[in-house]
Amino acid sequence: MSAVLSTENGLILKLYIQPKASRDQIVGLHGDELKVAITAPPVDGQANAHLVKFIAKQFRVAKSQVIIEKGELGRHKQIKVINPQQIPPEVTILLK
């Protein structure tokens, strides 16, 4: 499976998360996953909440439309984005 998979109602992203980074950004491919750096520390779910907010902003959807399907407690996550309004260029490249 590639890092980005298109489904009927959205996208499924396989992510590798780097918490406590200097800034929030989609870095690029990391093996067969998309690397995302976020500023939040991995404490008490702060990183997950921050990741959902960041992904929602990047894809221009509500936070409720970003669902962590797998990897709640680890760096490797699978996220579903329902009906994205915009797709960032880093992700568009991987869809082709």
Swiss-Prot record:
InterPro entries (alphabetical): DUF167, YggU-like_sf
Gene3D superfamilies per UniProt: YggU-like (3.30.1200.10)
GO cellular component term, pick one: cytoplasm
SMART domains linked: DUF167
Family: Belongs to the UPF0235 family.
Protein name per Swiss-Prot or TrEMBL: UPF0235 protein YpsIP31758_0827
